[in-house]
Amino acid sequence: MPFRKGWTLIELLTVIAVIAVLAAILLPVFHQAREKARQATCISQLKQLASATLMYAQDHDEVLPCFWDYYDGEGKFGGWIFYSTFAQCLPGNFDPSKGSIYPYIRNAPIYTCPSDRCRQGNSYAYNGALSPNPVAKVGPGFHFGLPLAAIQEPANIILFTEEETGHGSTDDGHHLPEGNYPTTRHHGRSNFAFCDGHVKALLPDNVPSQNFRYWP
């Protein structure tokens, strides 16, 4: 019977060291790949939300939905999403099914970015400038969405973005440039959907303020 040489301690430690080095190299690569996949999913979801919003406008005399988060009954005017409570990082704050664009999607999970750890039921924010006078809302039945014709450069005007949660305010579903801010969940970038339906990943600091306005 031939003699079988066993592993020496040095050989075993060498193998362990090589495995540790490979793990240190490969784990960040795997993490980046997973995050890229999550970002791609987020981009797809924003495209669906933008498409649903534009379909809503086509069915409502070319007028966009209101960003205000109130409910006026299924199929009626109301906010693009319903916000049920003003408390941060508690599950179920949002009820997409009561939002005005939900009949065009009917898929609540797409309202949450897979990289969003807060899990409130919504990760996205509507451009507040597209509802020109939300303060004047006095109750259900009032509609303050902007006519599509008023948007002079739809390819340059932001429709949705990923909202920062916990930045001095709740993640309330609408973005006000001076209040709530885009988050940077995807390697320092945030996904932005524009009024023509396309989506880009951008550095929030590089987005000019006029991209939030419907006028040039």
How would you name each of these model-derived features?
Residues 3-44:
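Amphipathic alpha-helical segments typified by the pilin-like N-terminal helix
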